[in-house]
A protein has these predicted regions:
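Bacterial N-terminal signal peptides that target proteins for export
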Residues: 1-10
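Acidic/histidine-rich alpha-helical segments that form the ligand environment
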Residues: 38, 100-145, 149
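Well-ordered alpha-helical scaffold segments within catalytic/enzyme domains
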Residues: 45, 49-50, 84, 118, ...
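N-terminal beta-strand motif that seeds the catalytic metal site of vicinal oxygen chelate
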Residues: 27-39
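Acidic/histidine-rich, surface-exposed loop or edge segments in extracytoplasmic proteins
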Residues: 25-30, 89-101
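N-terminal signal peptide c-region/cleavage motif recognized by signal peptidases
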Residues: 18-20
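Short, contiguous alpha-helical
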Residues: 36-40, 44-47, 57-96, 132-170
Length: 170
């Protein structure tokens, strides 16, 4: 008879504590940390694709009217370059970089690395209070880059390749 009472007492105690545990307020994520983490993640994945995709397929287009794999990457880092300049407070217009200036895979990868480094330096130099006021231009460039990451996954699959992040972990 004491066993059921003990179980009941323990059960009621747990039920009494559970709401208190769950009701503790959670701190919202720091805007600067959230933006920086998202920016770094999407650009790390894109750079990994840029370095991994076969050089002889950089000119691949799913349809003639679409950008090639290499042209998509140049388009993406045009946005990254824009964000770096706008993030520093420069009066800047979106100026599309000319993909013809990036003649091969090595040039595209180097240009992308440069754009990421420039944006990373701007992010690190930006006071965290700035992000609380507005996440722009960073939120827009993260969204833009992520959209094109998804597009480039299709380029991989159309070439019977597996994107780096979809491969089994070693």
């Amino acid at each position: 008879m004491t066993h059921p009472r003990t179980c009941l007492a323990i059960g009621l105690a747990v039920l009494g504590i559970a709401p208190a545990i769950h009701s503790q307020p959670r701190q919202p994520p720091d805007p600067m940390k959230a933006i920086t983490t998202s920016f770094n993640n999407v650009h790390k994945n894109l750079l990994e694709m840029a370095e991994d995709f076969p050089a002889d397929k950089y000119g691949f287009k799913p349809k003639p009217e679409m950008r090639s794999f290499g042209e998509v990457l140049v388009h993406v880092f045009s946005g990254t370059t824009y964000a770096a300049k706008a993030g520093r407070g420069e009066a800047v217009q979106w100026n599309e970089l000319d993909p013809k200036s990036y003649v091969d895979k090595a040039a595209v990868v180097a240009g992308f690395k440069k754009a990421i480094a420039e944006a990373d330096a701007t992010l690190k130099a930006t006071p965290s209070t700035r992000f609380a006021a507005s996440p722009e231009p960073w939120l827009s460039v993260i969204e833009h880059s992520a959209e094109h990451y998804g597009l480039l996954v299709a380029y991989y699959r159309l070439n019977n390749l597996v994107p780096p992040v979809s491969r089994p972990k070693k």
